[in-house]
Amino acid sequence: MKDGNIYPYRGKRSKAMIEDRLELNMENGIFIGLYLAEGNSHIKSGKVMICNNNTNILKIVEKWFNKRFIKNKTYVKKNENDYTSTTIQGYSVVLAKFLNKFVGSYSRNKFIPSEFYLAPIDFLIGLMDGYFSGDGTISKNSIEVSSASYELIEGISML
């Protein structure tokens, strides 16, 4: 055990090192933004999933997991229409619980916590970068995002 990290009270012990305080920096902002856009967490299984076909995004998420010694695996599925779906899964009950409580899970239940409104600019830049990389569209005349969560869209617009 290492000071400054959170460990599960029960269950398998792993090498994962989840910090007891989330530093509001660019790296964590990007991860949280990607999670808000493309992620989901399941507490019982301890899975934290981010679905995206962009290899650069998958590498960013894999690096974030690896830095914290979170076991992870990438899954690629092709359907009958030859559409590819890529998901990276990290395995940490502690992280799944944290994300569920801090920013929500499933598209319709996500939100921006009040702590983000006073966050450092680097974190907010990372958050927007991650979020727009997942759910955003930038065209010649507009910048758009979409979400099933009214609270998330409202929170993003207030940042």
Model-derived regions, located:
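Intein-associated homing endonuclease modules of the LAGLIDADG/DOD-type, together
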Residues: 1-159
